[in-house]
Amino acid sequence: MNINAYDFDVIKLLVIKDWQIYQKQLASYVVGLLIGLTLVGMGKAWSFYVGALLLLVLLICAGVFAIQSSVLNERKEHTLPFVMSLPVTPMAFYWSKLLANVSIYLVPFTLVVAGTAFLVLFTPLPDGLLVWSLLIYGFLAMIYFVSLGAALVVESEGWNTFVMIALFTMVSPFIMGVGMIDAIGTNIKTNNIVWSPPAVGIFLAEFAVIALVIGVTSWIHRRKTSFL
């Protein structure tokens, strides 16, 4: 990683700075997600669909807002001269942005995943929803990492916006497509938690894409000798 002890201290300070900027917005997203989980757990058809939609929308918005606040807006506001004045290498700055964004996103993401698992396992909701839900959340995490990776290496705001829109328009087709796979869809309304080969394959593919994004973006920044 080519990062020394001093870089770790700088990374920590930059991560804390991003957290301080985002904490109020993060709190509002957490409140909204708790409302969504409450609606899902009410056990009524209308509240389930409204709550599920709210969870998806807020989870997407939380990720997009984090990327725009800590990466795209800083670039748009021409903070590069300030960054160059800091005693930080391009690699350390990359890791600070990656860790800040991932740690921020993990708060709403973990809340939704844990909350969904609890509701599925301990309420009358069919247990078969668990695998389907985890695959959807894994897909959301995957496209978040791809969007973040693009923001970290592509300077054009237009291209970053295009990437985000293109990725998030794939959410609905993915949800429907996964549900149409027999090994997955046939268990959704049952109490059977089945990790079928297609489900495991999709889950592993999502993690592979995330690992690939981190590997490629870190390699690109490792080759940089300056911010220019």
Each language-model region and where it sits:
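Hydrophobic alpha-helical transmembrane segments of membrane proteins
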Residues: 1-78, 92-228
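Polytopic alpha-helical membrane proteins, predominantly small-molecule transporters/carriers
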Residues: 79-84
